[in-house]
Regions:
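Acidic, polar low-complexity linker/tail segments
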Residues: 18-48, 54-63, 183
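VWA/integrin I-like adhesion module and closely mimicked acidic/polar interface patches used
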Residues: 82, 168-215
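Sec-exported extracytoplasmic/periplasmic mature domains
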Residues: 67-78, 99, 126, 130, ...
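Second-shell loop/turn segments in exported
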Residues: 50-60, 92, 108-109, 124-135, ...
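Bacterial N-terminal signal peptides
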Residues: 6-19
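Von Willebrand factor
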Residues: 26, 41-106, 117-164, 191-204, ...
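C-terminal "exit" segments of structured domains
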Residues: 226-280
């Protein structure tokens, strides 16, 4: 199942007011736990952004990806969507990943509550040199992300992992085990499958990566994917996804997580391709 959604639709007057807009489900009202301590700053969402930097992505794509997140965070649409929540604030951390033991935090937990804090986070994202790593461990990224929520000084109504990637898991534990562990902790996982290149032997890309993400990676209430199929739409797709996440909205025709149906793509396809090719 494939879909697209425009930023204009998300921010159409009725949506910002809290009503339904075609293609977008209105957010469910939520309330904070009564036992939240006064000393803890409340936010609407705790968002972990987990970004793939494997060698299958070229340096230009990695640079555009970085710019996409930085520009999205400072965009008027993102800041407007953020203010639709009861707290009008989000907390986020941003890390890059490749193999099962290769994760680097670029932005530790930061609260965004307006243009000034958004600018500071965006500048921090852009100042770190772009790098690449070997192999692809989505499971490693999820396992790395989970304890970050326990270290977060802010408390949100939702906990979300936003994970991007251009290939299937081929390093570390199976992705479904990591996904299920996160779902067991009440964490939502959304996906940003990157499909701007045709699958090839040299890159270990697979057909229907969007199906793989839908059936093997994402999960939790309202989980969804935004697929990037055109390099020119890279930045808009990133912005659209972040807006949906901070506004607690999902596409009406969303993906149905694998827990509700059989996967259309084998969840161990990445491991099988690696084993067939390298024998280890």
């Amino acid at each position: 199942m494939r879909w697209c959604v425009s930023i204009a639709a998300i921010l159409f007057a009725g949506a910002i007011a809290g009503g339904d807009v075609a293609g977008i489900a209105a957010p469910n009202p939520k309330s904070q736990s009564a036992d939240t301590k006064d000393t803890v700053t409340s936010v609407d969402v705790e968002l972990v952004i987990a970004v793939d930097i494997s060698y299958s992505m070229d340096m230009d794509e990695l640079a555009v990806q970085r710019e996409g997140y930085a520009q999205a965070i400072v965009s008027r649409e993102f800041l407007q969507a953020m203010k639709t929540g009861p707290n009008g604030k989000v907390a986020l951390t941003y890390f890059e990943w490749s193999a099962s033991n290769d994760q680097q935090i670029i932005i530790p937990w930061r609260m965004i509550d307006g243009p000034e804090s958004a600018d500071a986070v965006a500048n921090e994202i852009m100042k770190t040199p772009v790098r690449r790593g070997s192999r692809t461990s989505i499971s490693g990224a999820i396992n790395f992300a989970m304890p970050l929520f326990d270290e977060n000084p802010y408390r949100g109504l939702r906990r979300v992992i936003d994970i991007s990637g251009d290939g299937a898991n081929n390093s570390g534990p199976p992705v479904t085990g990591a996904r299920d562990a996160a779902l067991g902790k009440g964490i939502i996982i959304n996906g940003l499958p990157i499909m701007v290149k045709e699958p090839s032997y040299s890159t270990m890309d697979i057909d229907n990566l969007d199906w793989y993400y839908e059936d093997c990676v994402i999960g939790g209430p309202g989980s969804f994917v935004v697929t990037i199929k055109d390099r020119d739409n890279f930045k808009e797709a990133i912005r659209t996804k972040l807006i949906l996440e901070v506004a607690d909205r999902t596409p009406e025709r969303r993906a149905v997580p694998v827990t509700e149906k059989e996967p259309r793509v084998p969840c161990l396809i990445g491991e099988k391709i690696w084993q067939d090719r390298w024998g280890r």
